[in-house]
């Protein structure tokens, strides 16, 4: 039986991959979520293999270059000045210290280096150091990404001129659930920043956080928003809430881990050429669940012992898992989707 015949024989006539162009209605995304688990994972793996090497995963390292004291009130975040989490606010790191961390990340096998700053938006006085960081990290042969909050047009242009590969600015959740998590920044603020990043010629890294108490339909609403961006993001990080003491979401019940795997699969189907990244909260998944995430179409993960202010599986454990699964680390330039 050919691959086409195999696909045609599967139950539930929902497209394996979105024809282009297609608007993903929330109801369509909900229908994907509600497929039997095996059917959903099978379809996601089909899509994944159409565009990527199914046994290659990109390793990314994330560094907090400016920690704590953020003006925003994001209910999940330990770095918000609105929450009493015991985290001490720090100034922007020196460029040399950032480059030292990037060298260590590369030596550990990472091909992508992400730099995150806890503030509402960068000030003009920060831009020279930020652009120097980008140039320095690129000179090491690493793919670069920054997440700095909202940007103005000129700031996006400066980062683009420095050679920034990706800018991360997450939508976090669906428009309907958003107001229950954040009040200091609107959904439209986030969309406007993504437009500025696109207009500057920088690749978009945009995803969200699940397990914040949202419904399945609201999770589908997030995926619908992401998939309907024009174009959808090149990089889609999916975070599993880490309920941090002192934040408003500290008492949130953990998400069913199979729902997390479903979310990875639905992201893969609706955004077939995106790099789908396992992000915060991976430490909460055992090896079997992480293997299911790779089967569902995840092909990147944050690698290293720390993600901003939350812990992450140790690098030795990740290497051992890769060896057991026959997965290899992929170079950044090898992660472009096949046409």
UniProtKB/Swiss-Prot annotation:
Protein EC: 2.8.1.6
Pfam families: BATS (PF06968), Radical_SAM (PF04055)
Claim: Iron-sulfur is one of the keywords in the record: yes
GO molecular function: 2 iron, 2 sulfur cluster binding; 4 iron, 4 sulfur cluster binding; biotin synthase activity; iron ion binding
UniProt keyword list: 2Fe-2S, 4Fe-4S, Biotin biosynthesis, Iron, Iron-sulfur, Metal-binding, S-adenosyl-L-methionine, Transferase
Binding annotation for [2Fe-2S] cluster: 114, 145, 205, 277
Domain Radical SAM core, chain residue ranges per copy: 55-282
Top-tier EC class: transferase
Listed pathway(s): Cofactor biosynthesis; biotin biosynthesis; biotin from 7,8-diaminononanoate: step 2/2
tRNA processing is among the record's keywords: no
Gene3D superfamilies recorded: Aldolase class I (3.20.20.70)
Cofactor, free-text remark: Binds 1 [4Fe-4S] cluster. The cluster is coordinated with 3 cysteines and an exchangeable S-adenosyl-L-methionine. Binds 1 [2Fe-2S] cluster. The cluster is coordinated with 3 cysteines and 1 arginine.
Entry-linked CDD domains: Radical_SAM (cd01335)
Domain of life according to the entry: Bacteria
Binding site for [4Fe-4S] cluster: 70, 74, 77
Cofactors: [4Fe-4S] cluster; [2Fe-2S] cluster
BP GO terms, sorted: biotin biosynthetic process
Complex and partners: Homodimer.
Function: Catalyzes the conversion of dethiobiotin (DTB) to biotin by the insertion of a sulfur atom into dethiobiotin via a radical-based mechanism.
Family classification: Belongs to the radical SAM superfamily. Biotin synthase family.
PANTHER family linked to this entry: BIOTIN SYNTHASE (PTHR22976), BIOTIN SYNTHASE, MITOCHONDRIAL (PTHR22976:SF2)
Protein name: Biotin synthase
Lineage: Bacteria, Pseudomonadati, Pseudomonadota, Betaproteobacteria, Burkholderiales
